[in-house]
Amino acid sequence: MPKIFFATDLHGSETCWRKFLNAARFYDCDVLICGGDMTGKAIIPLVEEDGHFTYTLSADQQQVSAAGVGEVEAHIRRKGYYPLRVTPERLAELDESSQVRADTFRQVMLDGVQRWMDLADEKLAGTGVRAFVCPGNDDEFEVDDVIRRAKRVELGEGRLVDIDGFTMISSGWSNPTPWNTHREESEEKLAERIDAMASQVKDPRTAVFNLHCPPYRSGLDEAPAIDADLKLMHGGRALRPVGSKAVRDAIDRYQPLLSLHGHIHESKGAVTLGKTLCINPGSAYEEGMLMAAIIGLDTKKGIKSYQLVNG
């Protein structure tokens, strides 16, 4: 019977990705699921001049010698950013053109995803472990093709997948957000997307819904309230539900055995909606901490066990 390790919202943290891959052996799991928003959000330029590199991280400008730049690049990747060595002239090009910035980020980001797929191919070879990735609303569409080419990682988006007698459906799309991200749409369209998969599930008692967005008003979707200028209200202490009504409706109607979510980093938890166990393991990728859920499944007993872990 499958033992699932589920993590989400790694946002480019290579430390978290390595921990994710190592979790199969550490926790004796045979299925790894990365639930969305796997890519980083920014490039950190390392400007090469006079035998050293200058860079800015966390508002601090620092210098490093050519001999130490590799260690700095590893540190940047651990925090979820993409290091990029540039000349002063190249930095000026990036500063002057939004199109150059966008094109450069996309290529560096895709190179980063390829790096992760290569790591997965190396670490999972010969283990029999199945690994699934379902890009989330923050991930650009070109990411999908990189994942499709991987040998040991399977793309989850839009598919029904059999996992030892359990049927998993997956989507990284979300309801609308204030940030106009890559994979978001109206609740109506999201409902159609989910129904297209869920309607094909033969038995909800052995169904897993891997849906990046958590269900509305489930307790797994509480995010700090923001104003019209995208600033935190009341110092971030005011929370409001921002989950998807389409996801909530799908869970209420189909009642799958298990639903896996992410998207809202602060809303870690596990709740039951009818017969469905819904889990959001949360995310602390900035700290290099991998937050996850381990779920043991049995075709007769359903959910044998589950545990929220971090490390």
Predicted regions span which residues?
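Active-site-proximal beta-strand elements of phosphoester/diester hydrolases
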Residues: 2-11, 165-177, 208-212, 277-283, ...
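Divalent metal-coordination and catalytic microenvironments
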Residues: 9, 17, 32, 37, ...
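Active-site environment of divalent metal-dependent phosphoester hydrolases
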Residues: 11-15, 39-43, 129, 133-144, ...
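Binuclear metal-dependent phosphoesterase catalytic core
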Residues: 12, 160-164, 181, 185, ...
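Catalytic phosphate/metal-binding cores of nucleic-acid and nucleotide-processing enzymes, i.e., regions
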Residues: 14-19, 27, 161, 204, ...
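Core catalytic region of metal-dependent phosphoesterases/phosphodiesterases
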Residues: 15-163
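Active-site-proximal segments of metal-dependent phosphoesterases and phosphodiesterases across multiple
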Residues: 99-110, 114, 208-255
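Binuclear metal-dependent hydrolase catalytic cores centered on His/Asp/Glu-rich metal-binding motifs
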Residues: 166-207, 231, 237-245
